[in-house]
């Protein structure tokens, strides 16, 4: 069985685990860097990016997550997780993990009172997906190597580059598990290549 970890530092960790399990994979909360070896893919959930970075530094996650990605293991960052993955962050001198060749702007749809839901056309899905946006970032620009997966109001809100997937919204806060399933399929593909 596939095992997908959810970084358990902050955010809707339990909801991500439930979504993973609804897709037929095993979900595991990751609280220590050494636990990364036990999972085939990793979800970095939403939360507050500055706090998340501080916790990642405290628990020494930055280099182990970079090494995890370098092995080709898939990573999915949602909301603040997208900010953690981005190579460039507007109004910030340096990136956090720098694994996805995109530039992001934080809180680009407004503060928490401006949280909203929107139906999105997502590449690979046959019907719209309802995105839950909460103090969401968006992707300002993406490298040629990056596949744009979804846009909202002219802004990129989901992108994929090789084994790295990121979105501005919270797929775990709906009962629609198709985006988690998309990530599970990425992890399956990685495992299949490994077995050859």
Swiss-Prot record:
Cellular component GO terms held in the UniProt record: cytosol; glutaminase complex
SUPFAM superfamilies in the cross-refs: Class I glutamine amidotransferase-like
Cysteines paired by S-S bonds: none
Catalytic activity reported: aldehydo-D-ribose 5-phosphate + D-glyceraldehyde 3-phosphate + L-glutamine = pyridoxal 5'-phosphate + L-glutamate + phosphate + 3 H2O + H(+); L-glutamine + H2O = L-glutamate + NH4(+)
Coiled coil: none
Binding site for L-glutamine: 47-49, 106, 134-135
GO terms for biological process, alphabetical: glutamine catabolic process; pyridoxal phosphate biosynthetic process; pyridoxine metabolic process
Keywords: Glutamine amidotransferase, Hydrolase, Lyase, Pyridoxal phosphate
InterPro entries for this protein: Class_I_gatase-like (IPR029062), PdxT/SNO (IPR002161), PdxT/SNO_CS (IPR021196)
Active site: 79 (nucleophile), 170 (charge relay system), 172 (charge relay system)
Pfam families named in the record: SNO
Subunit structure: In the presence of PdxS, forms a dodecamer of heterodimers. Only shows activity in the heterodimer.
Protein family: Belongs to the glutaminase PdxT/SNO family.
Name used for this protein in its record: Pyridoxal 5'-phosphate synthase subunit PdxT
Species of the source: Bacillus pumilus (strain SAFR-032)
Lineage summary: Bacteria, Bacillati, Bacillota, Bacilli, Bacillales
């Amino acid at each position: 069985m596939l095992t997908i970890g959810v970084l358990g530092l902050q955010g809707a960790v339990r909801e991500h685990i439930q979504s993973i399990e609804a897709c037929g994979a095993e979900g595991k909360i990751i609280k220590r860097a050494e636990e990364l070896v036990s999972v085939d893919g990793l979800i970095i959930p939403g939360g507050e990016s500055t706090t998340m970075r501080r916790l990642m530094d405290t628990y020494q996650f930055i280099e182990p997550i970079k090494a995890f990605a370098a092995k080709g293991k898939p990573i999915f960052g949602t909301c603040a997780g997208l900010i953690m993955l981005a190579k460039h962050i507007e109004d910030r001198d340096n990136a956090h993990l720098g694994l996805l060749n995109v530039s992001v702007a934080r809180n680009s749809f407004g503060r928490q009172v401006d949280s909203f839901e929107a139906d999105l056309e997502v590449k690979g899905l046959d019907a719209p997906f309802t995105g839950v946006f909460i103090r969401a970032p968006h992707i300002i620009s993406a490298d040629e190597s990056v596949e744009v997966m979804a846009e909202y109001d002219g802004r990129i809100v989901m992108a994929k580059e090789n084994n790295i997937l990121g979105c501005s919204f919270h797929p775990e806060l709906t009962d629609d598990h198709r985006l988690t399933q998309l990530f599970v399929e990425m992890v399956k593909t990685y495992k299949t290549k490994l077995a050859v």
